[in-house]
């Protein structure tokens, strides 16, 4: 692989969707040819050093919590390009750091790749930000996208003929798989027994729709007695969800686990019978689900899924085959999907098996990484 510099404001140990996305890709690229320029996490340089020491490639941290296309970031990037003979610069999130594309070329890089996610769609709706997107895409050789939805929203701002590459998250089908031992252990931890259980594993933010699950739950329990809802994760919406749980007439059937260790995430998916995250677009279209890696992980684990209609989320599901796609704002549709799946073990088994087969066929890492390397190496 050509010598590559990843410039990103989104990198572990900070937790988030883009952080996980870049972590998954960088760990699979040839380490000797990769350098990362990243910000320092809120936990401080010690946390960054501890994380980076376990990586096979070099990570250069700037002493700031956020990288922006400022003169100091530009200068540091250009110095790395010159000192390490970098040929390809990859901006892990196109906006806003992709504005440094021209500066990367000025320092000697011959190729620029920018990766888009969900937030660039928000930028595309703001007049001033649209101009920035046009400039970012003009300076790039390749624009990657995580879903057909995001590509459709962003292509009008790209120059004619700009090369695009589908580069969604893959799923590790060895890590996320049916796991009877983890399922048994965690169901015992939370006192689930043999209860039909819906799990939602995600960051707690309003877009994800955990509040809709809690709101729908009394009607679900009425039709599926003994059903349990387990919401896994942490985030700014945690306090709101805790309040909704306390006010629910079926609060005893709802569990909020809080944050769990990363190595326990696959097991928390596996302990469920159904995975549901009825995500919905918010903020007049500014806050949208770019894809939804959690749906892929649930399918790989052999669970039927219920996904919302926001952004690219429906692209992770074969509707009616691996799960159901519902409008996250339609409580009746959500209740119907939850009850249908919880009430029919045969349906759950068929959907789960189909989901696992789909992940193995279309969403595994080797082919996705090969496509990225090909884009990096192209002349």
Task: Enumerate the predicted regions with their spans.
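Short hydrophobic beta-strand element within catalytic cores of glycosyltransferases
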Residues: 276, 295, 300, 304-307, ...
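Carbohydrate-associated surface elements
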Residues: 149, 170
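Short His-centered aromatic/hydrophobic patch
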Residues: 91-97
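Acidic donor-binding loop of glycosyltransferase active sites
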Residues: 270-288, 303
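A short, well-ordered alpha-helix in the C-terminal region of glycosyltransferases
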Residues: 226, 333, 340, 347-361
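Nucleotide-activated donor-binding/catalytic signature segment of Leloir-type glycosyltransferases, i.e.
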Residues: 239-266, 274
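Conserved acidic donor-binding segment of nucleotide-sugar-dependent glycosyltransferases
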Residues: 318-320, 324-331, 340-346
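Conserved donor-binding/catalytic core segment of Leloir-type glycosyltransferases
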Residues: 192-208, 214-218
């Amino acid at each position: 692989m050509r010598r590559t510099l990843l410039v990103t404001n989104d990198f572990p140990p900070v937790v988030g969707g883009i952080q996980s996305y870049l972590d998954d890709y960088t760990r699979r690229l040839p380490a000797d040819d990769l350098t990362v320029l990243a910000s320092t996490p809120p936990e401080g340089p010690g946390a960054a050093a501890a994380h980076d020491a376990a990586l096979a490639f070099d990570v250069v941290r700037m002493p700031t919590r956020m990288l922006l296309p400022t003169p100091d970031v530009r200068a540091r990037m250009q110095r790395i390009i010159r000192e390490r003979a970098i040929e390809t610069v990859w901006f892990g999130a196109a906006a806003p750091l992709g504005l440094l594309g021209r500066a990367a070329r000025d320092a000697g890089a011959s190729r620029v790749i920018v990766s888009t996610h969900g937030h660039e769609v928000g930028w595309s709706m703001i007049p001033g930000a649209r101009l920035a997107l046009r400039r970012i895409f003009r300076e790039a050789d390749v624009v990657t996208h995580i879903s057909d939805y995001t590509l459709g929203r962003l292509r009008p701002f790209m120059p004619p003929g700009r090369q695009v590459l589908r580069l969604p998250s893959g799923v590790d089908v060895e890590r996320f798989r049916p796991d009877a031992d983890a399922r048994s252990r965690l169901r015992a931890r939370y006192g689930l027994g043999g209860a039909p259980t819906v799990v939602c594993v995600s960051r707690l933010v309003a877009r994800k729709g955990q509040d809709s699950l809690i709101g729908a739950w009394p009607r679900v329990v009425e039709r599926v007695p003994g059903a349990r809802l387990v919401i896994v994760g942490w985030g700014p919406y945690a306090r709101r969800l805790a309040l909704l749980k306390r006010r629910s007439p079926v609060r005893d059937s709802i569990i909020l686990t809080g944050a769990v260790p990363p190595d326990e995430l696959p097991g928390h998916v596996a302990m469920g019978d159904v995975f549901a995250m009825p995500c919905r677009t918010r903020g007049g279209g500014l806050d949208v689900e770019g894809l939804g890696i959690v749906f892929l992980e649930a399918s790989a684990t052999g669970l039927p899924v219920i996904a919302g209609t926001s952004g690219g989320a429906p692209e992770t599901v074969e509707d009616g085959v691996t799960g159901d796609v519902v409008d996250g704002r339609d409580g009746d549709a959500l209740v119907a999907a939850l009850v249908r799946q919880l009430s029919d073990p045969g349906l759950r088994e068929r959907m789960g098996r189909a989901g696992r087969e789909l992940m193995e066929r279309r969403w595994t890492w080797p082919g996705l990484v090969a496509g990225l390397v090909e884009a990096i190496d192209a002349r």
